[in-house]
Amino acid sequence: MNMLTYDQLGLSSDAINGLEPTAAAASAGAVASAAAALPAGAVSKPVFHADGSETVSVHTGGLTFNLTFDAAAAAAPESFRAGVELAAAILSSAITDKATVNLAIDYAGTGGGAGANISNGLLVNYTQLKADLVDHAAAGDTVFDHLKAGATIQGHAMVAVSNAEAKVLGLIAPNDTTTQDGFATFNTDIPTQ
């Protein structure tokens, strides 16, 4: 596993103020400080929409993330938005593929449930997907060599691939800004204290 250093992310360890992955907890102020320490221009000025949502672009490396915060997320504490932007910046620095990923960020109660789903994507032939993964692997990376041989996986010839993954693999236009490539719902029903 490759670990990014603070210098590679354009951050100082002083600005992070305890955000190391091994830290038990990070304060809201530390998240805001870390996001503020992002390189100049890493986060665009917000574009405000009539429905109360707002969109920012985050770019520190290969990927560009267009984050559309719903009205509740836009009104959430600054530390929440700063944390999401910081996470996007870290991923942007770590993933070198040139693509634009459009994510909807929701801040709402879910009634106590949890869920995961692919919001938008396509079905891809398993043989093609395996070849694309091998072709896009970093030099010397053999992890995809261990995928099941043959034309099917668990009896299926087609595999669901999210738009974000399809963009990075070149299966759809990598910089299409009209697609919703994914979403993240942050559950406000879970107590934070």
Model regions and ranges:
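Extracellular zinc-dependent metalloprotease catalytic-domain scaffold
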Residues: 1-193
